[in-house]
Regions:
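Zinc-dependent deaminase
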Residues: 19-48, 112-192
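Short beta-strand scaffold segments in enzyme catalytic cores
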Residues: 53-61
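A short, polar/charged loop-to-alpha-helix boundary motif
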Residues: 73-83
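Helix-adjacent hinge/juxtasegments
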Residues: 78-79, 87-120, 124
Length: 192
């Protein structure tokens, strides 16, 4: 119904070039499908004790690269999911430009990753969860769509937001519980 189309448009405000509800629905389903792939990558990060952030890059309707956060494992700030996926995509395409590619990220990119996305000329970015503390895709800054740059990225926000947000929240809840337990044990040892 028309009201359903309107509701989806409200959820994904800022979306342009949607001409019909049918077109919108087809695109939404495709975005959801690829965001699920990014979520699978995020779960790999969680399995190695890293913050669960995942990314996939799609070209011509096919996933050409995947990445997940390995910052803690690799002990480098450069091991963000987006950068790892971009490196693979560039190698696969044989070019540093990722034109005609869509990147699906479970968490809004930081300033480093947003800058790399713009520099690589990624056409479109689909974000799961926004990042109020470090997001540069619209939360704190919007580097992706800045008119001052020579390239702007089309951005869709909130695709599978609940699932992406809950995965991160659960990870940090668990981390806080572990830290509390360690603190409790240290205190107990000091008292003995």
């Amino acid at each position: 119904a028309a009201s359903d189309v309107y509701k989806r448009q409200v959820i994904f405000r800022g979306m342009s070039n949607w001409q019909t509800g049918e077109h919108f629905m087809r695109k939404y389903t495709e975005d959801e499908k690829f965001m699920k792939e990014a979520i699978k990558q995020a779960k790999k990060a969680e399995a190695i004790g890293d913050v669960p952030i995942g990314c996939v890059i799609v070209h011509d309707g096919k996933v050409i690269a995947r990445g997940y956060n390995k910052r803690n494992k690799d002990k480098t700030v450069l091991a963000h999911a987006e950068l790892l996926a971009m490196k693979k995509a560039c190698k696969k395409l044989g070019d540093w430009r990722l034109e005609d590619c869509t990147m699906y990220i479970t968490l809004e990119p930081c300033q480093m990753c947003a800058g790399a996305i713009v520099q690589a000329r990624v056409t479109r970015v689909v974000i799961g969860s926004m990042n109020a503390k470090a997001g540069c895709g619209g939360s704190i800054l919007n580097l992706l769509e800045m008119q001052e740059f020579n390239h702007q990225v089309q951005v869709e926000r909130g695709v599978l937001q609940e699932e992406c947000s809950e995965m991160l929240s659960a990870f940090f809840r668990k981390l806080r519980e572990i830290q509390k337990e360690k603190k409790r044990k240290r205190k107990q040892m000091q008292e003995e």
